[in-house]
């Protein structure tokens, strides 16, 4: 159902295998978020409140603080707030970390890691927003998502796929 919906929304330009994998894992991820404290609105009978026939109502503004708190509870995890990653540290054909600059203190960071995941949130900031005038950046996606993480990955030799695919957040 989700794969068909997303395929139709994208005029057929999708990788169905990726859509299927995402849809198969979505409920599990949402359940984990709810256990971490994300409020998913429910009616008096305990059933999820929907917005239309494909969306649940959530308090989504709390997702980042909830995930940040969960990350802080993990062993061997450091959180660097307000650090802008400027490039990946590459050795041979492996990304071994990243370089960053503290945006409040101009500190240069050398970060070493066993694994690096590019999770930059898209590149919506490349496009002109639909909203006019002073409301230009009152939109779902942050205007600062310019695709820099993708560009760093490509420069480092990472394989990239499905840039044409738009994520549709449905459950």
Where are these regions (language model features)?
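Conserved N-terminal/central alpha/beta ligand/cofactor-binding core
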Residues: 1-102, 107, 119, 123-136, ...
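Amphipathic alpha-helical segments in well-structured domains
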Residues: 64, 146-149
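Well-ordered beta-strand positions in beta-sheet-rich domains
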Residues: 108-112
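A short acidic, glycine-rich active-site loop
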Residues: 136-145
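Acidic, metal-coordinating catalytic segment for phosphate/diphosphate chemistry
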Residues: 153
């Amino acid at each position: 159902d989700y794969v068909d919906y997303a395929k139709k929304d994208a005029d057929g330009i999708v990788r169905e295998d990726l859509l299927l994998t995402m849809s198969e894992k979505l409920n599990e991820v949402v359940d984990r978020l709810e256990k971490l404290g994300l409020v998913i609105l429910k009616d008096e009978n305990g059933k999820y409140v929907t917005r239309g026939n494909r969306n649940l109502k959530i308090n989504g503004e709390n997702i980042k603080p909830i995930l940040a708190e969960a990350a802080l509870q993990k062993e061997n995890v450091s959180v660097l707030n307000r650090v802008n990653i400027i490039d990946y540290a590459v050795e041979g054909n492996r990304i071994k970390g990243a370089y960053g600059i503290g945006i409040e203190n101009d500190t240069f960071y050398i970060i070493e890691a066993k694994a690096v995941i590019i999770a930059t949130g898209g590149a919506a900031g490349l496009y002109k927003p639909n909203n006019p005038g002073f409301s230009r950046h009152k939109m779902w996606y942050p205007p600062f998502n310019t695709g820099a993480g993708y560009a760093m990955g490509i420069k480092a030799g990472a394989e990239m796929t499905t840039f044409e695919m738009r994520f549709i957040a449905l459950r």
